[in-house]
Each structure stands twice: as structure tokens, then as C-alpha cells.
Amino acid sequence: MGKIIGIDLGTTNSCVAVLDGDKARVIENAEGDRTTPSIIAYTGEEVLVGQPAKRQAVTNPKNTFFAIKRLIGRRFKDDEVQRDVDIMPFKIIAADNGDAWVEAHDKKMAPPQVSAEILKKMKKTAEDYLGEPVTEAVITVPAYFNDSQRQATKDAGRIAGLEVKRIINEPTAAALAYGIDKKQGDNIVAVYDLGGGTFDISIIEIDSVDGEQTFEVLATNGDTHLGGEDFDNRLINYLADEFKKEQSLDLRNDPLAMQRLKEAAEKAKIELSSTTQTEVNLPYITADATGPKHLVVKITRAKLESLVEDLIQRSLEPLKVALADADLSVSDINEVILVGGQTRMPKVRAEVSAFFGKELRQDVNPDEAVAIGAAVQAGVLAGDVKDVLLLDVTPLSLGIETMGSVMTKLIEKNTTIPTKASQTFSTADDNQSAVTIHVLQGERKQSSANKSLGQFNLEGIEPAPRGMPQIEVAFDIDADGILHVSATDKKTGKAQNITIKASSGLSDEEVEAMVRDAEAHADEDAKFEELVSARNQADGMVHATKKQIEEAGDALPSEDKEKIEAAMADVDTATKGNDKEAIEKATQALMEASAKLMEIAQAKAQAGQGEQAQQSNEAPADDVVDAEFEEVKDDKK
């Protein structure tokens, strides 16, 4: 059997490693480099990847793609995609299904298709080193990648001719690389991963006993649209603004100038990690009627730090959430590992060190640790690495939409994967023959505040009073963090299932704010939940009262019937509003108005007609959650 390789598919740079004996080794590419720029160029005649693509970017900006990982699994209309549309020299377009795609030489391409070119380069690099074909790989993704982004990464692997044996989270891979040689004791490690396009924080416990190691992720958090590219963009915009002030020309309208500006900004940022001042000097950056124009701007480290200060602070918020989720304090963290090229910035290192109150580990290569960890995991899967157990988690809660537009969670965030969960739900209407299962991801109570992952129909439910059918919804997350959902009618055995392949990624605000928003809006969510509960109780009371009126027939005096119907109308009006007290008051008034109905029901029961009353008041099983599924219309079938 051939080797399984480990690939760090990065936003800015990618890296490939393989287990060589009992050590993971990073493989140098054809250019002699240990990392490969994640840049792809279409010249019209050939596809260039890595340094060759980067070298020709200035002369071919519209057909040279970089940071493509920021588009993978996302919709064109997403806010963060729209921000990139304005500053990228290449064309980002909307695909027919609304996804964010790119275009080169009038050819439309999906991000997984472009990312596959990088994976092909990694595959070839490994094959040249090993001297044998490579068909299997472990590929890393940001811990906070959602379901569709993980699926899109697997698709890229398949396009590149690789069977993706496992998708592994980048901080977890870095912890594997760090901890694999440390064979004794317990360590709680914080992995701060600020890469080219994404940010993750994972709190990981490494337990080593008698040569056996367990790597357990306690909590993870992050932002899938925060990274070195954003730091570069701050500097690019600053340089463009300075030039505009001086020359009254906006370089943002010139793709060639923007490509040169991007390269210069990235170079200046890197230089300012080792020096306190640098100069950006770009002769002949553009021209107007008066002649050629040159850009010359001095930048200090302090100026760069002021431009990106809020980005660094943004990365600290998820640290607080992750610690709280793990039920730990800063003092419980034994080691802090920095991963990702952007962590070389002194200001980033200083802020993270200050946050945790301790020195940072210096023995982890921020560019290579993730690929090495992926190679270790590949060795575990191949059986070459023994006595290592990796327990990863799902970053966001998963559930379905139920009655009152509430998200009912089946799997909580930071649950160890793989995992399964199921719950029994029922119908909202009498004789409902079909339900729609709406799958959601996020932390808020209101369905609309969470990410919709997809929906599917379960049809052929036998006619029955509402609340009687028992529909079991099961969630199954595999080791890659990809979700499979099924719904089964317990009575008929009819089932429907889906592997979630949502075409959209989480937007910047959704990803970054989901957990924090849930905490910030805790009171709002609690009130919303109480309001929905009051509405559901009121609806249930109206439904039961209508049935009792039918059963009472002529035994119910018309005067009482009119009072009850008026009370039901009041309940109906109240439930359309957002006043919980008004709904509860109207429900109580209906109960009081229905006193005569209770007397009639009791009289009928005493007269020996209890069987019919028992059937009409029969309740669903205890484990059935009152849920509302929209009935499938003809045009949805």
C-alpha cells in the first residue's frame, strides 16, 4: 500500500509532509522550497502553481489567483466575498447557483477546482520524493470551517486525484506535531493559529501515560475570514490612499498597479517583523497625461501596528470564548503554540503572550507544524503510528427548525467527533402527510439567526391527529466533521436522508459572532424562548378547545359557545403579537370560558362514553418534542 501524505492547504502557502520511519518530514518542492505559495496562474497555454505563478503575477494579474481558500464553500453575495471583490485584481463572479467562483480567460471556475491545482502540486512533490504514486492524503482545514467548506475541500482533493482519508483541523494538527515526541505527563496546550486567511484557537489536552498519547480538543473557536491577507489589505489601502493624496490618482482602478502594490505590501510587512522601518518604492506604478508616476512611501513598524491593531484585538475575543467553553482559566494553560505565518509579527506575539501571561513556545515552526501533524495523522490511519488517539470536536451546534421558528439543537458545539444524536419530533397539523426537515448550524435560539445548511422532505406520513406521528431525526457527524441527517417515520418505517452539501459558507459576521452573539443576546434569546412557549401553549389550547366543541355538539349552550369562540379569537389576535403577558392572559381567559366544556366532557365520561374522550385527549409519547414542520406544497415536491 502506498504512503498517505499530509497536506496543509493554506490560504497563502501550502506544505506537504510524509512519515519517514517514525519521524514526519516536510518535503521540498521542485523549486527547492519547503512551502509552496498558494497561487495559481492560467496563462492561456498552461497552468502555473507556486513560485512560477507568483513571478508572473504582475504581468498577468487578471488570470492569477491567490487566497482562493477564502472563497471555498461561500456564496457570492456574502459580505466578506464582496469585500474581496473590490480589492482582488482577478474577477470574482456569481455562479448559476449563487456560489462565489472566479474567471480566467472567459472560463468560469469553482474554488475547489482551482484549489485542486495546488493539491496536484503537493501530490507531485510527494511522488517525486517517494518515487511511487500517491493516491491518499490527510488534508487540513481551519477548525472553524463549516460543513460545506469541509465538503468543498474534500471535493478539491478528489479533483486532484486524491482520496481524502481524513479532514483534520489545523490547530489539532499543530498540537500533534508539537506533542508527538513528548511521551510523559499531562499538558493543556493553547494553539493560536493565525494564517493567511483564517484564524483558529483550540484548547487541547495532551495526556501521555506509559507511551500512550491522547490528544483531546476541549474547545475551539475562531474566524474564517481573519488572517495575513487582511493585514496586507490594510497596508495596501494605506499605500493607495497616500498615493491618491499626493497624485490625485486611485490605483484601485488599475489591476496591474494593485498586483505590484500587493507584492510590495506583503514584502514590507515581512521586513517590519525584523526592522523598525522600511520603504516601499515602486517606480512607474502608473501614468497620466502629465507622465509616469512613482510611489515612494516610508512605513514604520509603529504605523503598521496602528493599521492592524483592531485585527489583532479581534483575534483575542475567540480566546476568551474558547477558555470559557473549556471551563478553564488562563492559568490552566501550560503551553502556548503559535501557528501560521502572521504570528511572526512581533505585535501579535506580544499581545498573545500578554493575554496568556506566559512565554510562547519557540520550538514550533509556524509554517510547517500543520503539515507535520497531518503526516502524523496519516501515519495513525495507515497503522504506522501506534498508541496515539486523536479526539477532535465540532465547532458549532447543529439542529433543526421546530415550532415557532426555534432551533432545537441535537448536537452541541465542542462535542467530540465522530458522534451521533437523535430525537423524536411530531407534526403540527392534523392529517399532515409530509414534513420538511430544515437543518441549521449555530448557537442562537431563533432559526433565522443561524446558518441554514439545507433541507429535505419526508413524505408519505399516514393521516393522524397532530402530535401523534413519531418522526425520528438522526444526526451523524463523521471524523471529517461532515454531517449526515436522516428522518424516519417510526410507524411506517419510511426514511429520507441527506449528506449536507450546502453550497454556501458562513459569512464573516455569522462565523465570528455566532458564539459571542449567543452570549451577548442571552436575555433576548431567553425572552424569545418564553414567547414561543406561550404561543405554543396558546395554540395547543385553541386546538384542544375546537375538538371539545365538536364533541360536545348540541350539549353546549349557544351562549357558552359564543363566549368560547370570542375567547379563541382573542387568543388568535394575541399570538400574532410579541406580548407574552397578553398571550398568557388570553389563554387563561379561554380556559375560564371553557369551563362549561369541561363539565360536559365529565358528564359524558360518567355516562360511559369515556373511550371517545380518552382518544380525543390522547397525548403523544413522553419523548416526542412538539415540533412544527411546514407541509410540503405541490410545487415543492
Curated annotation (Swiss-Prot):
What HAMAP family would the database entry show?
DnaK
Q: Which organism is it from?
A: Shewanella loihica (strain ATCC BAA-1088 / PV-4)
| UniProt-annotated stretches for the region Disordered | 602-637
SUPFAM superfamilies, per the entry: Actin-like ATPase domain, Heat shock protein 70kD (HSP70), peptide-binding domain
Q: Does the keyword Chaperone apply?
A: yes
Query: Matching PROSITE patterns, A to Z?
Result: HSP70_1 (PS00297), HSP70_2 (PS00329), HSP70_3 (PS01036)
The Gene Ontology terms for molecular function here are: ATP binding; ATP-dependent protein folding chaperone; unfolded protein binding
Q: Where is the composition biased (Acidic residues)?
A: 620-637
Biased composition (Low complexity) is annotated at: 602-619
Q: Which family does it belong to?
A: Belongs to the heat shock protein 70 family.
Residues with PTM Phosphothreonine: 198
Induction (UniProt): By stress conditions e.g. heat shock.
Q: Name one Pfam family in it.
A: HSP70
Tell me the classification of the organism that encodes this protein.
Answer: Bacteria, Pseudomonadati, Pseudomonadota, Gammaproteobacteria, Alteromonadales
Please give the function described in this protein's UniProt entry: Acts as a chaperone.
Q: Name the domain of life this protein comes from.
A: Bacteria
Q: What is this protein called?
A: Chaperone protein DnaK
Keywords in alphabetical order, please: ATP-binding, Chaperone, Nucleotide-binding, Phosphoprotein, Stress response
